[in-house]
Amino acid sequence: MSTLEENYQYCHQIMKDYSKSFSYAFDMLPEQQRRAIWAIYAVCRIVDDSIDVHQDVEYLHKINRDVKAIEHQTTTTFESDDRIMTAFADAATHFQMNFQALYDLIDTVEADQHFEMFETDRGLLDYCYGVAGTVGVLLIPILATPPSDEAYEYGKQLGEALQLTNILRDVGEDYRNGRIYFSKARLNEFNVSIADEIERDQLSDNYIKIWEFYATLADNNYDMVLNHLDVYNEESRMIIELAAQVYRGILTEVRKADYSLKDRAYVSKWKKHKIYRNLKKKYKD
């Protein structure tokens, strides 16, 4: 049987495998906080992977039952991943977990198996909350103690901005996988067809306008979060700013690539390290 410390280290390794740069940043938090972050990240990861990788809805249901058992403290044996759930259960004894956000994530991941285009931006924004705003909310009790309503709102906004940024980065790739995340109403408003844009040698002005419309929504969220860093614990602020700056950098890279629908734009390791070094200097000073 694994020890509690081994369970936390298992969660830590999952975070390092999937998100090395952010894992490194979170590792600067005090021990109890960073261990809770590892556990939350690992739970969210297996929720995503249950459908995205394994197409196993029953495993997702097992995760859901395990989370309920942890919330109500009804068992110490789990149906899904015992190591992750044991670490998460321990973290939940130290921090005021927002279990509803985790249930919302699980519900969104399950519903996403039967994806349909969103009629309006309300559907798109609800989706962004469900897959990423929820994660922002889950992290707030660790990053802002005690968690305030404002901190929860900005955590939600940051998560939604990160997801919207992912969507703006992956328009072409998502289309080839049978998905269009821009809402029908907004596509009609801008008179844009993603199928037609894929076939063009040069993207239309209208496509660039709709892309920038959504980028502005993400940017507004980033601005809101960065203007209210004081709601977070002092040791958490650099991490929040790092996430916002790195992901905002993705929008810049898409523009530099002329909004290409063929290749995925990304922030280079060198640029990430530069952002990290600059922030470390800023917060050290």
Swiss-Prot record:
Coiled-coil residue windows:
none
In which pathway is this protein known to take part? Carotenoid biosynthesis; staphyloxanthin biosynthesis; staphyloxanthin from farnesyl diphosphate: step 1/5
Amino acids binding (2E,6E)-farnesyl diphosphate 1: 18-21, 41, 45, 169, 247
Pfam families (alphabetical): SQS_PSY (PF00494)
Q: Could you confirm whether the keyword Acyltransferase appears in this record?
A: no
What GO molecular-function term can you cite, just one?
Answer: geranylgeranyl diphosphate synthase activity
Question: Which keywords belong to this entry?
Answer: Carotenoid biosynthesis, Magnesium, Metal-binding, Transferase, Virulence
In which residues is Mg(2+) 1 bound? 48, 52
Indicate yes or no for the key word Magnesium.
yes
Q: PROSITE patterns in the record, alphabetically?
A: SQUALEN_PHYTOEN_SYN_1
What's its catalytic activity?
2 (2E,6E)-farnesyl diphosphate = 15-cis-4,4'-diapophytoene + 2 diphosphate
Please list the residues that bind Mg(2+) 2.
166, 170
GO terms under biological process: carotenoid biosynthetic process
Which PANTHER family does the annotation name? BIFUNCTIONAL LYCOPENE CYCLASE/PHYTOENE SYNTHASE
Q: Which family does it belong to?
A: Belongs to the phytoene/squalene synthase family. CrtM subfamily.
What does this chain do?
Involved in the biosynthesis of the yellow-orange carotenoid staphyloxanthin, which plays a role in the virulence via its protective function against oxidative stress. Catalyzes the head-to-head condensation of two molecules of farnesyl diphosphate (FPP) into the colorless C(30) carotenoid 4,4'-diapophytoene (dehydrosqualene).
Q: What is this protein called?
A: 4,4'-diapophytoene synthase
User: Which organism does this record belong to?
Assistant: Staphylococcus haemolyticus (strain JCSC1435)
Q: What is the lineage of its organism?
A: Bacteria, Bacillati, Bacillota, Bacilli, Bacillales
